[in-house]
Swiss-Prot record:
It comes from the Archaea. This is Uncharacterized protein AF_0612. InterPro entries: Peptidase_asp_AF0612, Peptidase_aspartic_dom_sf. Gene3D superfamilies: Acid Proteases.
Amino acid sequence: MFVNGTPVIEIVLSNPLLSVKFPESGSVLAVIDTGYEGFAVVPQDIFKKLRLDELSQHKRALTLPTERLIESTGSYARIIIPELKTFRDGFVETTDGVDEIVLGTEFLEGFKLVLDYCTRSFEISSCW
């Protein structure tokens, strides 16, 4: 689906090591961003709700479209796509100023995407 011209998908975030998920019920919208090469970036409050700050942390440098470098902190988590009954595990990071959940190209590996801006339709399916 599209929201204000941006492709989004319904997901559930999970920390399987500590049995925590976000949201606790239902799903949340995440932005698909093919310009972001990482797995996922989330707001700091969601990172804390998932208790990812209690796991081993890794720091990375992210390059913004303006070529400015910022530091992110992250850990490993699971992203579930209820519509496809599938999930992917990967590095979920956070940094100051993030106000939405963003899924990048590392997350999208193994999926087929069809974005049709003419009809504002979005299709996703697993390659496997």
